[in-house]
């Protein structure tokens, strides 16, 4: 889900996205990990990121990831937003928890957002090198996980 407004989301996907698409009827919402690409002109500022955080909390999803576009084509290069441009830690009630960077290949960090006593887990991820995929999927000996988030289990 790359935008909080269904009309704008429909524009991004170039097709109509019905509002009921985010109802998640019959799905254990605690297992959902919402991912939002950072795209210039859409989610590209602290204000837009906060609206996305608030929408995620309103839906009841426990975690969201903001992911930078990889430089794989002209569109991605022209619409790239660096994680630092979002200034996630400038948003009130966002708290840094940990970071794992892989030099020039990967920038990853985790945060928590608290709104009215409701907690939202946030991860920020940007792979600058499209050929770099180390730690994208991790097997911890018991579960297959995406990234370094402890509770992000792939079924």
Where are each of the predicted segments found?
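Radical SAM enzyme [4Fe-4S]-AdoMet core and its adjacent flexible, acidic
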Residues: 7-20, 25-129
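Short, solvent-exposed loop/turn segments at secondary-structure junctions
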Residues: 4, 39, 70-71, 143, ...
């Amino acid at each position: 889900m790359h935008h909080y407004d269904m009309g704008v989301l429909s524009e991004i996907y170039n097709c109509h996205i019905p509002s009921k698409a985010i109802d998640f009827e019959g799905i254990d919402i605690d297992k959902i990990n919402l991912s939002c690409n950072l795209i210039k002109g859409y989610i590209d500022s602290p204000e837009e990121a906060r609206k996305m955080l608030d929408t995620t909390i309103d839906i009841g999803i426990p975690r969201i990831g903001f992911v930078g576009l990889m430089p794989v084509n002209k569109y991605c290069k022209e619409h790239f937003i660096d994680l630092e441009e979002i200034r996630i830690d400038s948003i009130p009630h966002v708290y840094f928890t940990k970071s794992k960077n892989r030099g020039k290949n990967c920038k990853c960090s985790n945060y928590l957002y608290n709104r009215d006593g409701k907690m939202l887990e946030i991860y920020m991820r940007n792979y600058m090198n499209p050929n770099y995929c180390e730690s994208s999927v991790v097997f911890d000996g018991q579960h297959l996980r995406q990234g370094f988030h402890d509770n992000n289990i792939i079924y």
